[in-house]
């Protein structure tokens, strides 16, 4: 099965192509939500080199909503277009996603925090959820065993104190409040590997970022 994996939820973006038992193409870069140029350059490169995938898997976070939406939009465009031609713009991608025909490529999503580049079979993931809150999740064998749950700093510190020193604790950015947390990033190569599992618990379209809170909707004044 030819698999294309896309991960843009953290400060390190990555893209991977897998055909068989190992990844044939892996790219990672410093991910800037204001500049998606490197992502689309690598996306064009992998298309030219390998052609059409059978499956596209997207990391859904939690993390950067902007980055995750870009990844989802690009994946929708490729799945609807059959993986041919140039990479669609955001506007074209959204139009195809709403009004296009049946996709010729399988499109799935998976929590980015379950695809951390590490050797640990079990670990905890924490992150800054803004508004003086943090999220906590526990991952076992690349699946969510707990969370993600929002907590105050005090609640998270109490939670972490219950784990012994052998438990790995990761975050996608440096959190000075929690010295024990090691910076690690989600990895498209791991996502591609997980997508090859026919029994995987994947999200199906319509794909959305993993929201830690309900999406904020502004109602226009009349």
Task: Tell where the protein language model's regions lie, with residue ranges.
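Oxyanion-binding and handling regions
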Residues: 1-24, 32-38, 86, 91-95, ...
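Bulky hydrophobic/aromatic packing residues
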Residues: 13, 46, 68-70, 82, ...
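Phosphate/pyrophosphate-binding loops at sites that engage ATP/ADP/AMP, CoA/4′-phosphopantetheine
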Residues: 42-55, 162-164
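DPxDG-like acidic metal-binding loop motif
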Residues: 55-83, 104-105
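Short amphipathic alpha-helical segment that frequently serves as the phosphate-/nucleotide-binding helix
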Residues: 39-40, 72
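Active-site phosphate/pyrophosphate- and oxyanion-stabilizing loops and adjacent acidic/basic residues
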Residues: 44, 76, 114
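A generic structural signal for ordered secondary structure
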Residues: 15, 49-50, 74-77
